[in-house]
Amino acid sequence: MTTVTAQQQAELIKNSIKSIPDYPKPGILFRDVTSLLEDPVAYAASIDMLANRYRNTGVTKVVGTEARGFLFGAPVALALGVGFVPVRKPGKLPRPTISESYELEYGSDTLEIHADAISAGDNVLVIDDLLATGGTLEATVKLIRRLGGTVNDAAFIINLFDLGGEQRLTEMGVTCYSLVDFPGH
């Protein structure tokens, strides 16, 4: 039986992510995580690597951000044996919610979480597909903390390391972990 190292898994994941030039606008090099989802070996490796990192760390909930964070957060939550909580755009969750607005490059956006999804004392791991500037994750962390949860860690498939997201979250006391790093464009 062949043993695959974490470095080999990370290389498999990185190689499965397609780079699309000039999408969604000229000058942007888009990192397409959906190509990773099309490769069952790479997708499974990403879930395994995240679950192995956070197994036995006291995580009580996994929060995933809309929408690709759901694709990685829910399977990791199952692997850890804990609940999964979605953070969504306004009007998408049926029970009472709390919301947090955040600034984008051109405008603002809002995220919501069910008001009863996180309990005081929950140790929450936040998972998303990609970390760029960190605005979405900052709003997500604020929502969780408003509900009494603790967020010490956030995990990503991709970190666009030169766009400042990791520094932004570090300043909030959140340790970032990513499977692969790419420059942002």
From Swiss-Prot:
Record-level GO BP terms: adenine salvage; AMP salvage; purine ribonucleoside salvage
The entry's keywords: Cytoplasm, Glycosyltransferase, Purine salvage, Transferase
SUPFAM superfamilies according to UniProt: PRTase-like
InterPro entries: Ade_phspho_trans (IPR005764), PRibTrfase_dom (IPR000836), PRTase-like (IPR029057), UPRTase/APRTase (IPR050054)
Subcellular location: Cytoplasm
Gene3D superfamilies in alphabetical order: 3.40.50.2020
Record bears the keyword Glycosyltransferase: yes
GO molecular function list: adenine binding; adenine phosphoribosyltransferase activity; AMP binding
Catalysed conversion reaction: AMP + diphosphate = 5-phospho-alpha-D-ribose 1-diphosphate + adenine
Record PROSITE patterns: PUR_PYR_PR_TRANSFER (PS00103)
Signal peptide span: none
Involved pathway(s): Purine metabolism; AMP biosynthesis via salvage pathway; AMP from adenine: step 1/1
Gene Ontology CC entries for this record: cytoplasm
EC number: 2.4.2.7
Subunit structure as annotated in this protein's UniProt entry: Homodimer.
HAMAP family the UniProt entry points to: Aden_phosphoribosyltr
Family membership noted in the UniProt record: Belongs to the purine/pyrimidine phosphoribosyltransferase family.
NCBIfam families: apt, PRK02304.1-1, PRK02304.1-3, PRK02304.1-5
Function: Catalyzes a salvage reaction resulting in the formation of AMP, that is energically less costly than de novo synthesis.
Protein name as it appears in the record: Adenine phosphoribosyltransferase
